[in-house]
């Protein structure tokens, strides 16, 4: 068995990442699998580690296993974006795990491979790339989705929450997001969004949020784009506009089951290349991580990423 490298986020999923790693490490030692492991110490560290690992005797680096949440995997693919011959594996240990849902990845897959109970399959899919129009040299990649508008605004408010450190110290992290959501609901203003695709430019008014999805799942399992397929080189775009306050929450309830697609004010279409423009700078996130503001362009990655499951 070839040399394996691990990047582990020990704090993912309320320290579930560390527990998962210890169980895997036990099997690796038992089966005498040659490996090296690296634990992240702060946000952004997984990207740095991935970039550093890719320079360590590249002939050895054929397999990289990531243990953590969607944010950890997001950092790693951005650290390895110039390396085409590496096979990635993912062991879900986070809170949302949309990536593992979208690709039917289970925690037990790697353990079964180590025990030689299961023979792994290698699948390919195309990442999405974000090009910032203000700085065309800056490019980032995403695996799951892009969110523009309200949900990104909530995430931003959660990061800026005035008493965030106090709540974390008191182990009241679970209250930060709901309180930020309430504040965002009272202060967020819908916006006008222009979308330019390969064929046309469309304009949407009174927009609450827009989602660009690489697979069906969003926000911890909601089926925002039920027909999205990560093996296609197209994105599924969902735009929600003209929603009264209460109806917006009913829409989110239906979205949990993928039943929102025919509601008034919901527009869905596919595109390979799309640029978003707004009059004001509207925040957006990639895979749940706040990345910047509009305008920006999305396209499919030129070469596919290989995932071993």
UniProtKB/Swiss-Prot annotation:
Q: Which organism is it from?
A: Bacillus subtilis (strain 168)
Q: Which GO terms describe its biological process?
A: phospholipid biosynthetic process
The protein's superkingdom reads: Bacteria
Which keywords describe this protein according to UniProt? ATP-binding, Kinase, Lipid biosynthesis, Lipid metabolism, Magnesium, Metal-binding, Nucleotide-binding, Phospholipid biosynthesis, Phospholipid metabolism, Transferase
Q: Which family does it belong to?
A: Belongs to the diacylglycerol/lipid kinase family.
State the InterPro entries in the record.
ATP-NAD_kinase_N, Diacylglycerol/lipid_kinase, Diacylglycerol_kinase_cat_dom, Lipid_Phosphate_FormReg, NAD/diacylglycerol_kinase_sf, YegS/DAGK_C
What the record notes about the co-factor is: Binds 1 Mg(2+) ion per subunit. This ion appears to have a structural role and is required for catalytic activity.
Q: Name one GO molecular function term.
A: ATP-dependent diacylglycerol kinase activity
* UniProt cross-references to SUPFAM superfamilies, sorted A to Z: NAD kinase/diacylglycerol kinase-like
Xref: SMART domains: DAGKc
Q: Identify the taxonomic lineage of the organism of origin.
A: Bacteria, Bacillati, Bacillota, Bacilli, Bacillales
Q: Where does Mg(2+) bind?
A: 229, 232, 234
Its Enzyme Commission number(s) read 2.7.1.-
Q: Do you know which NCBIfam families this protein is assigned to?
A: YegS/Rv2252/BmrU family lipid kinase
Q: Which cofactor does it need?
A: Mg(2+)
Q: What residues bind ATP, as annotated?
A: 9-13, 40, 69-75
Gene3D superfamilies in the record, alphabetically? 2.60.200.40, Probable inorganic polyphosphate/atp-NAD kinase, domain 1
DAGKc domain: residues covered: 1-134
Protein name listed in UniProt: Putative lipid kinase YtlR
């Amino acid at each position: 068995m070839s040399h394996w490298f691990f990047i582990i986020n020990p704090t993912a999923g309320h320290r579930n990442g560390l527990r998962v790693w210890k169980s895997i490490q036990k099997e690796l030692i038992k089966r005498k699998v040659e490996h090296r492991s690296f634990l992240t110490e702060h946000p952004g560290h997984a990207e740095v580690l991935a970039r550093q690992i890719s320079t360590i005797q590249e002939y050895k680096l054929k397999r990289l296993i990531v243990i953590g949440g969607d944010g950890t995997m997001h950092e790693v693919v951005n650290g390895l974006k110039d390396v085409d011959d590496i096979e990635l594996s993912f062991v879900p240990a986070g809170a949302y795990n949309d990536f593992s849902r979208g690709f039917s990845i289970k925690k037990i897959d790697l353990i079964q491979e180590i025990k030689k109970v299961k023979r792994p399959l290698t699948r390919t899919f195309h990442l999405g790339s974000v090009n910032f129009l203000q700085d065309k040299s800056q490019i980032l990649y995403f695996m799951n989705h892009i969110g523009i508008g309200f949900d990104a605004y909530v995430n931003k408010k959660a990061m800026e929450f005035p008493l965030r450190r106090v709540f974390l110290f008191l182990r009241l992290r679970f209250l930060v997001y709901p309180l930020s959501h309430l504040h965002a609901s009272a202060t967020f203003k819908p916006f006008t969004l222009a979308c330019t695709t390969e064929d046309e430019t469309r304009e949407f008014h009174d927009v609450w949020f827009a989602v660009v999805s690489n697979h069906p799942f969003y926000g911890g399992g909601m089926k925002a784009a039920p027909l999205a397929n990560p093996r296609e080189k197209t994105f599924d775009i969902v735009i929600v506009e003209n929603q009264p306050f209460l109806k917006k929450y009913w829409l989110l309830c239906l979205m949990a089951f993928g039943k929102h697609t025919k509601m008034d004010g919901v527009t869905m279409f596919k595109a390979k290349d799309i640029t978003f423009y707004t009059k004001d700078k509207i925040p957006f996130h990639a895979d749940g991580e706040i990345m910047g503001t509009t305008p920006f362009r999305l396209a499919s990655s030129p070469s596919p990423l290989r995932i071993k499951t």
